């Protein structure tokens, strides 16, 4: 019985580790065949935008409808502008 529990635990851990670099497209309203690399990059834009604006709702709005809303576009622009600004 202990072996079975250990195997189940190991499988769970390996599944979590293997899935670290992948996201569920359905969570973002995207088609299942979306390129994972593109999904990760767009997700990162939304995370950076949320950090820039310091508001939790930004991430949710940014990723809506597979990153096709004006919120995502504005996040890209905001991040580009933030890069141009000299550090304080």
Curated annotation (Swiss-Prot):
PROSITE patterns in the cross-refs: CHH_MIH_GIH
Subcellular location(s) per record: Secreted
Keywords assigned by UniProt, alphabetized: Disulfide bond, Pyrrolidone carboxylic acid, Secreted, Signal
Task: Indicate whether Cytoplasm appears among the record's keywords.
Answer: no
Similarity-based family:
Belongs to the arthropod CHH/MIH/GIH/VIH hormone family.
Described purpose of this protein according to its UniProt entry: May increase the toxicity of alpha-latrotoxin and/or other venom components. Is non-toxic to mice and to the cockroach Periplaneta americana.
Q: What is this protein called?
A: Alpha-latrotoxin associated low molecular weight protein 2
Which species does the entry assign this protein to? Latrodectus hesperus
